[in-house]
UniProtKB/Swiss-Prot annotation:
It holds the Pfam family Med28. Disulfide bonds: none annotated. It comes from Drosophila pseudoobscura pseudoobscura (Fruit fly). This is Mediator of RNA polymerase II transcription subunit 28. Its main location: nucleus. InterPro entries: Mediator_Med28. GO terms for molecular function: transcription coregulator activity. GO terms for cellular component: mediator complex. One of its GO terms (biological process) is regulation of transcription by RNA polymerase II. Component of the Mediator complex, a coactivator involved in the regulated transcription of nearly all RNA polymerase II-dependent genes. Mediator functions as a bridge to convey information from gene-specific regulatory proteins to the basal RNA polymerase II transcription machinery. Mediator is recruited to promoters by direct interactions with regulatory proteins and serves as a scaffold for the assembly of a functional preinitiation complex with RNA polymerase II and the general transcription factors. Residues 76-108 form a coiled coil. Component of the Mediator complex. The keyword Disulfide bond does not apply. Keywords: Activator, Coiled coil, Nucleus, Transcription, Transcription regulation.
């Protein structure tokens, strides 16, 4: 292995020593030792610079070794790249499969909604109910008095719909809301 100074050990040992001395200078808590703040900052700066220098030397060492491997054994580099690509392909295939599964769930939900709309008969209008000015059905006669602040025929939310909502559309809207609640985890799955 490459050595920086004779007798100082290998580069990995130097890196470990520089890291430990850097941590020691950062975590040292000796307010009563007679050293002032400037001396501590100088020591931290010195040990940090030493750590960065040794890290750069290690990076250069490994880059040299990588270059040697790529020139002497180019098939190893290609093998590594193939392995990385196969891992990336597997990850993307899993992601695609997840999206396909979600798509199938949504298709099934849409199919259920469409079948429910076509198979569901429209409810007959009760002779005791009249259609109000907003298209909402209201009981004939006295019925329930309107709440204060709301006009008769307005839904409880206070906003008048533009027109009457067909029962099939209402059913589809409810089914979509139920599916959204299931997807958010607020309702148990079917």
């Amino acid at each position: 292995m490459a050595q920086n100074d004779p007798g100082s050990g290998n580069l990995m040992d130097e890196f470990e020593e520089a890291f430990q001395s850097c941590l020691l200078s950062l975590t040292k808590q000796e307010p009563n030792s007679g050293t002032n703040k400037e001396e501590i900052e100088l020591e931290v700066q010195k040990t940090t610079n030493r750590f960065i220098d040794v890290a750069r030397q290690m990076e250069a060492f490994f880059l040299q070794k990588r270059f040697l491997v790529s020139t002497l054994k180019p098939y190893m580099l290609i093998k590594d790249e193939n392995q990385d690509l196969s891992i990336e392909i597997q990850r993307k295939e899993a992601l695609l499969q997840k999206h396909y599964n979600r798509l199938e769930e949504w298709k099934a939900c849409l199919s259920d909604i469409q079948q429910g709309v076509h198979n569901r008969p429209t409810p007959p209008i009760n002779p005791g109910m009249l259609q109000g000015p907003s298209g909402m059905q209201q009981p004939m006669g006295g019925g329930v008095p309107p709440r204060p602040g709301l006009m008769p025929g307005m839904p409880p939310g206070g906003m008048s719909p533009v027109g009457p909502m067909p029962p099939g559309q209402q059913h589809m809207l409810q089914a979509q809301q139920m599916q959204q609640l299931r997807m958010m985890g607020k309702l148990p799955p079917k």
